[in-house]
C-alpha cells in the first residue's frame, strides 16, 4: 500500500523531563478550576478545531467520522472484499471485541494531536509580550482532559460538569480581551450536517448540532436531564469501577463485554460495560446514545479519555496480564473472520510514527507515554520501586472510588444525616416502552470482599464477620443487537409503578442497569457497520453487572428488609 499522504499518529511529541516526567491529562473540573490558562486554551482551540472545513482529513468532522458514520475510509485505509457490508464500506468498529480498549488509545492520540495543532496556533496568536509567553508556556503542557464520571464531584459541583451544559463561556480571547464565546464543549455544530449527500440518514441529519436527551417534539437538546441521572447512579458507578480496578485480574474479562460461555461468575462486568452506561445515561436518545454518531458529541472525547485512564490504572496494577489471542469474530481490513486476533493485530486506520505500518496493541499497552502523556495516578517516575508505585495507585483508587461498600455506605449516611437527606444515590434509566428480546438475568453473584480500611459502624458489624462481607451483584447477559437498537436492562429492589416508565428515572427502588448499545440491522435505520451486521447475524451475546450491596444496606438500615425477599427482586428491559 502506498504511504503517500499517510498521517502518522504520534500524539503530542514529547520528551521526558529530567525526572522522567510527562505532562498530565487532568480531570476537566480540575483543569477549569486550577489551570485556567490550559482551560482557556482548550476552549479557544477546540472551537478553532471544530471550525475546520469538514472535507479536511484532520478536521473534527473527519476524525469523529472514523468511529461510525458516515462510514468512509480514512487515512488511505480502505477495505478488503471480505469486509464490505452490503451498503459499502463497513467501518473500523472494535466494540465488543478484544481490541476495544487498545483501538481507542491511538484514536484518542490522533484527536489530541489534531487539537494540539490548534492549541499551538491559538497560543501564538496572543499579542507579543507576557500574555503570549504565558499561553505558549501553558501550551507545552496541555493534554486532553478527562471527565471522571465515577468519582465524587468537588464540593459545590454538579455530577455533570457545567462546561458540558453552558452554551457560552467567558474566555481571554487572542486579542487579550475577556469576552463571551460559544462553548465548543457544549456541542458540535455541523457545517453542514451532510457535507456529502447521504453522510447521515434522516434519523440524524435533522439535527444541526449534537444533542442530549432531545425533546421528542422539537428535537431540542435537554442537557439539564443529564446531571440528576448521573448523580443518582454515582454509588453504583463507584462500586463498579472499584470492583473492576481492584478485583479483576484478567484483561479479557476487564476490558470488553462480549459474553463467553467459559466466563466465571465474577467476570460478567467490564470497562466496556461501564463505558456503555455513560454513553446511554448522557445521551438519552441523542448522539451519545448511538455508537454510529457518538464521537461527534464533544463529551465523547472527555468520556473516552477517562476510559483510557481507567485502563492505564488497571494495566499498571496488572502489568503481566494482557489480551489472549482468539479467533477474529468478524472480518476487518487486515484480518478475515476466524483468523487469530492478537496483540499484534493492526489497529486500523492508525498509522504508527513511521507512517508505514499500523499501531498494534502490543506497542501501546505498557505506557501512555508512548503518546506523550500520563495521568495523575500513573506518575511512575515518582517512585523508587514498582511495589511503591502500585501501592500509590491502590491508594488513589480507594480515595476516589472507595475502599469497600460498607465504608462508602457509612460515609454516605453520615453526610446524608447532616443534610437531612437520607436517600442514597442510586442509578436510574431513560424510560421507553419495553419490547421483547432474549435476555437472561443470572443469579445474583456473591463475591467475598475483605475490607482493608475504614472501620465498620458497630450496628453493621454483624454483616461483615471477620472483616469480610458478601458483595452482591446481578449478572446479566443479552443479545446485543436483538432489539435493533440501544436498550437497557434495569434492576429494581422493591416495588415500582410499572404503569409509568417515566417515573423509573426517580424511583428509589431502582438499583441500576446494564446498557446495551445495539444497532439496527433492518429497515431504513440499518447500520452500515459491517461488524455489527455480522454480530447480529451471529446473535452476539454481551454481559454486564449491577452491584446490589449498597442498595441492600440502605434497606437494612431503613429496616426495609422486604426488598431482600425474592418476590421483590425485579428486572426489566427497555
From Swiss-Prot:
Cu cation B binds at residues 275, 279, 304. Keywords: Copper, Melanin biosynthesis, Metal-binding, Monooxygenase, Oxidoreductase, Thioether bond. InterPro entries: Di-copper_centre_dom_sf (IPR008922), Monophenol_mOase_fun (IPR016216), Tyrosinase/Hemocyanin (IPR050316), Tyrosinase_C (IPR041640), Tyrosinase_Cu-bd (IPR002227). Its cofactor is Cu(2+). The keyword Oxidoreductase applies. GO terms for molecular function: metal ion binding; tyrosinase activity. Cu cation A binds at residues 67, 95, 104. It is an enzyme of class 1 (oxidoreductase). There is a cross-link at residues 93-95 (2'-(S-cysteinyl)-histidine (Cys-His)). Pfam families: Tyrosinase, Tyrosinase_C. Binds 2 copper ions per subunit. It catalyses: 2 L-dopa + O2 = 2 L-dopaquinone + 2 H2O; L-tyrosine + O2 = L-dopaquinone + H2O. It comes from the Eukaryota. This is Tyrosinase. The lineage of its organism: Eukaryota, Fungi, Dikarya, Ascomycota, Pezizomycotina.
